[in-house]
Amino acid sequence: MDEMHSSDTLLLRTPKSKKKIGLVIPSTPSKKCKYSSGFIAEDTTPSKRFRLYQAKFKTSSKNVKAQTLSVSIKKNQGEITNPFMTEGYNDYRNIVSPGLSFDNDCFSEHELVSPLSDISSINSTSPDVEKIDSLDPFGVDSFVWNCKPLVNKEALELHRMIHSSFPMSPLESNSDVPLLLPKLKKRLSPVNRSTFKPTRYEPSHRLLKPKKSILTVPAKSLNLIVSSSRGSLNDATIFATEINSTLSNEENKLPAISSIWEKLTIPVNSSIKEKYKKLKDQIYGQASNFGEDEDNEEDNEDDLPDAAVIRGYEFQSGRRDELTQCNELQSTKDYKKVQWAKVLEQ
């Protein structure tokens, strides 16, 4: 039994080959890119792409010093000129820095620095440099400085000082130095000219009498005129308006008049005529009754029938034979132009 027990214990043991495992647990790689001394990347496989971060240098508000300019208003009389006479030329000879007493002085170190530059405007020999380095050793401040208001302010100040140096008061009469002013071109009105001739709103034709008519009249056609049997112009206008409106439809046709000896009489319903007159009086008023005297005379003649009379009249034109007219029209094709007057009366 002892042997059996010993054999069981041997069978339950873990073999030595299973005790040691050659597997290595991988560690989470760094997301940053690592380079060796020879600028060769190490054999690493990161889980995400590494990002290259570039430091953003911001302008420190502590290292900016506003610069001002002053203009000397003392000028010699020989230097008085108009700067607007020459284009693209600006005279800044009298603009001096406040740190200089006269023109022969040299600019100091802090005056050569622009307010937009990242370089400190404090002199390198000044003891204030150590204070700034202790506060911000890298020259980077968390405050983002906006330079646009300062630039606008400096530009307006410079513009004001330049224009303030110009002589605002006129020169004395005893002064021999002339003040040059820009020459302005005088625009003369065409009305004041001696050669000006006012014209009317009339077109200037190439030909005084155009040979071709605008309206084309058919051959052997008549001009139909409507009149009233009682001689009233108002009634004739009403009759012609009604006839033109009814002739627009194909169903309403009137007998054609082929000669000047023919006459067409159409009886008229007087109630319709009175309806038109009342409607016209409501729209235009009593002033439209320009034939009131004739209407009073017509009222006395009740025995005359109320009717519309249509007569035909020939067109009177100075045209010649058709062949001669065709030749004239062909020769005047180049003259079909109208030129309006160049100068119109105002």
Swiss-Prot record:
Principal place of residence: nucleus
Coiled-coil regions listed in the entry: none
Feature: compositional bias, Acidic residues: 291-305
Gene Ontology terms describing biological process: cell-cell adhesion; invasive filamentous growth; mitotic cell cycle; positive regulation of filamentous growth; pseudohyphal growth
Membrane among keywords: no
Compartment(s): Nucleus
GO CC term, one of those recorded: nucleus
Keywords, sorted A to Z: Nucleus, Transcription, Transcription regulation
Stretches for region Disordered: 289-308
Job description of the protein: Probable transcription factor required for superficial pseudohyphal development in response to nitrogen starvation.
Protein name as catalogued: Superficial pseudohyphal growth protein 1
Organism: Saccharomyces cerevisiae (strain ATCC 204508 / S288c) (Baker's yeast)
Name of the gene encoding the protein in the UniProt record: SFG1
